[in-house]
Amino acid sequence: MADREGLNGPLSRPEVLDLLGEGRDLSGANLAGISLVGLDLSGASLREANLSDADLTQVNLSSAALQGANLTRACLSLANLAGADLRQCHMERAVVREADLRRATMLWVDLRSADLRLANLTEADLRGARLSNADFRLAVLSAANLSEALLWDTNFERAILQEARLVGADMSRARCSGAIMWDADLTDANVVNADFSDVDLRQTMITTDQLAKAGSLEGAHYQGEQSLRLRLLRGLSLGRRKG
């Protein structure tokens, strides 16, 4: 069995397979640029591993320990990350399209400018995450926790955010057109210049004072006691745009 220092140099796919076969902990391993397409790494220990620019397409990383790992620019399309621990991971500009991130632990993860289109993040914990300029179009974030997350210029167009928690999140200039935010909690969220056009805001916890600062409310859907006040706000929003 190779000693611990052997993990510091770049590893090849065959070497990774051998180490996994030996039950080795790959925490801190240098896997930059490696292709691990389609491998079963479920439950693997990859804490603080360097996986920058790695091709992890369709890799099974369910329940894997990836705390603090470097996944910058990595390709994780169609990967299974359900239940994985991604706390404090660096995932800037990563491609995570159609990935399964259900119930993943993603506190303080850095996903700036990442592509998460069509990804499933149901019940994922993204508290304090850095998600500015990330692309969540058509993604599923039902019951996800995005409290205190940084969502500047983030794209949530046609995403499902039903029952999501966005308490204290900074959604400045976020693009939410066509999103479903039914029963979401936006208490104390910053929505300055956010686009809520055609958004389903029924039962959403958000104040009219917050929405008065939004960029657009055209076609937004709401009901109950909020309805009249939000209709008036939508008119004010449209008036500002025309002016």
Model regions and ranges:
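Tandem repeat scaffolds
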Residues: D3-G243
